[in-house]
């Protein structure tokens, strides 16, 4: 089978109605656009959210909150993902080497999700209470 020989099954596709080709077609003269107005013209569109000059909903509602810039350089790592780290010391560079966090990450936190079987030493990372208990139960330790 060649891609350039593929075609739809016979009768499965209908040709679209051609606009502006006589009154008898049902789509002659104005071609389904109605009479006059911005939307009848070529290129006649209004931008998304435009409400005809009325104050748009987006501007009627109050602003709220903000996005912390620290969230762009912070990441969470699941406990089960620590198995992908080679070696027994887990720090930020080890997480980057194992492709668990991207290169722009500066802060990481280990959270309790899944299980850990090997003993690891966690250095310079924040750890949740549950994850800390699980790491220590597996024979590992946490260093600041």
UniProtKB/Swiss-Prot annotation:
The protein here is known as Large ribosomal subunit protein uL15
The region called Disordered is annotated at 1-57
Which terms does the record give in the GO molecular function aspect? rRNA binding; structural constituent of ribosome
Q: Which GO terms describe its cellular component?
A: cytosolic large ribosomal subunit
Comp. bias regions, Gly residues: 21-31
Supply the HAMAP family for this chain.
Ribosomal_uL15
Biased-composition ranges, Basic residues, are 32-44
User: Do you know which InterPro entries this protein is assigned to?
Assistant: Ribosomal_uL15 (IPR030878), Ribosomal_uL15/eL18 (IPR021131), Ribosomal_uL15/eL18_sf (IPR036227), Ribosomal_uL15_bac-type (IPR005749), Ribosomal_uL15_CS (IPR001196)
Q: Which GO terms describe its biological process?
A: translation
This protein's source sits in the domain of life called: Bacteria
């Amino acid at each position: 089978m060649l891609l350039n020989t593929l075609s739809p099954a016979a009768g499965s596709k209908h040709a679209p109605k051609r606009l502006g080709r006589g009154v008898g077609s049902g789509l002659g003269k104005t071609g389904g656009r109605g009479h006059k107005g911005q939307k009848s013209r070529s290129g006649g569109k209004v931008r998304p959210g435009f409400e005809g000059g009325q104050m748009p909903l987006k501007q009627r509602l109050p602003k709220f909150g903000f996005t912390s810039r620290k969230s762009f350089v912070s990441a969470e790592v699941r406990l089960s993902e620590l198995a992908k780290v080679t070696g027994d010391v887990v720090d930020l560079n080890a997480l980057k080497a194992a492709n668990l966090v991207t290169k722009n990450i500066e802060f990481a936190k280990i959270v309790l999700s899944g299980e850990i079987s090997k003993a690891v030493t966690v250095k310079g990372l924040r750890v949740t209470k549950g994850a800390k208990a699980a790491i220590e139960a597996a024979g590992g330790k946490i260093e600041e």
